[in-house]
Amino acid sequence: MTLLERLGGREAITRGIVHTFRILSRRPRPSRHEEAAGEELDAYLRGLGLSPVRDGAGNRMADVPPAPGRGRAPRLILQGHLDMVCAVRPGSGWNPLADPVTVMEEGGFLRSDGRASLGADNHLGNAAALWLLSTGAVNHGPLRLLFTTAEEVGLEGAKEVAPDWLARAEYLLNTDGFHLGRAVVGSASGRRETWAAPLDAGPAPALPAWRLTLSGGRGGHSGDDINRGRANPIKLLAAYLAGLPGGRIASLSGGLTHNAIPAQAEAVVFCPAEPDLSPLRAALAGYRAADPGLTVACAPAEGPERAWTPAFQAHALAFLMGLYHGVYAMEPAFPGTVGASANLGRAGTEGDVYEVCAFLRSTRPEWEAELAGRHMTLGTAHGFSLSVTGYPGWPGDRANPLAAVLGRVWWEQTGRTLELSAVHVGLEPSVFRAKAPGLVMASAGPDILDAHSVDERAPLDGLPDYALLLAGAMEAL
């Protein structure tokens, strides 16, 4: 009997993974708030007869005994993360701390109801691995399941994983990939920058107030989508406001988090007459192909009592316009892969501070240093101070033995060659390298489109192929 037959066929695989994904999605799980989702996972693991262990960071680990006759096989760690980037559609009322994702199947895709991101990153990979184990049909060796927290805010959970949790294992397969048919053997470093300047405001001028809104952008993942030419509404609106005659800003905000491309931005501005939006519309025209849903609107606003001082306004706008956003360099060792980039992800007022969030990624230290130095010079010149966290890169290795196993399995199952790649995202193997130097690691995931956005979705027809790849690798090791 073939592996596909043992798993019940393609439709049964799809149904099983989707059902498991729905179970895992029943609890809210924004980064640093994964405890309820972790309890849901614990219950699922106990239902499989396993004994999950939790550490102080909320990470979970559970050992899975080998199938009969496979006790001498090398131990494989299957690893994913619990948290998700909670992109929220403006005006939807969705609360990431209280509301679970509404999971839907529509047009051949798994997606949310459009109010929020789906969270297939990374729970779809987790669901595939867990469903396979629930079937009892996979002839695997000793396994360890490892689920981390706060991956989306700088791999924080991975940094707290004890080396003992990685010990006595030969291989680690990370399920946090976005492209079916690809094995990832390297990833970019990440530098999470939070810039802050004391908000300097004074009495509002005696002028009409207007609310300017840029909305409908596609947004997306600041690593996986940074090369797609999508607009950054924060930068577009800042550039427009810098050229608005007589305009005084009361507020300027946009975006959600460091590592998501912003999909919207909004400003309230005092202006003698209704602002002429034609320069902004002309700027949007350059993004019509990559960001067709972008729209701009202007409406009268209830005037706030205070507005930014002219000096603070000039500095803040110059800082926003000067921050690098987009691809900085391509990686020649892996043609077609972005080597370095920066994302201006969020801007807005926090109490009496104006805060700006950026995320730098790089496969090479010198590129990250160049971008970081450029930002530091800019921030210092305009009165912004920096708080920074980060994580190392994972150097790509084309001779990766685990990727070779995945490649053989993929060829046997599909007749196609598995792509070998480094990726322009942060992956937890970059942190695990120092904790377990001899551990052979690779990453492979299902297809996920527009992660970190309300348009996030996953094609259903690829789920059986992904499950068969995972199961085949478990049996081949």
Regions found by a protein language model. Give the residues of each.
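Acidic/His- and Gly-rich active-site-bordering loop/insert found
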Residues: 3-109
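Active-site metal-coordination/substrate-binding segment of hydrolases
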Residues: 70-148, 152-153, 159-160, 165, ...
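Short, conserved charged micro-motifs
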Residues: 71-72, 273-280, 365-371
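Acidic, glycine-rich active-site loops and adjacent beta-strand->loop/helix elements
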Residues: 82-84, 146-154, 176-180, 218, ...
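Midchain, well-structured core segments that form catalytic/ion-binding scaffolds
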Residues: 101, 106-111, 152-153, 158-361
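His/Asp/Glu-rich mid-to-C-terminal helical/loop segments that flank catalytic regions of hydrolases
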Residues: 164, 229-244, 312-321, 328-332, ...
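Active-site-adjacent substrate-binding region
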Residues: 230-253, 372, 389-391, 396-439
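Zn-dependent metallopeptidase/amidohydrolase metal-coordination segment
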Residues: 332, 339-355, 359, 404, ...
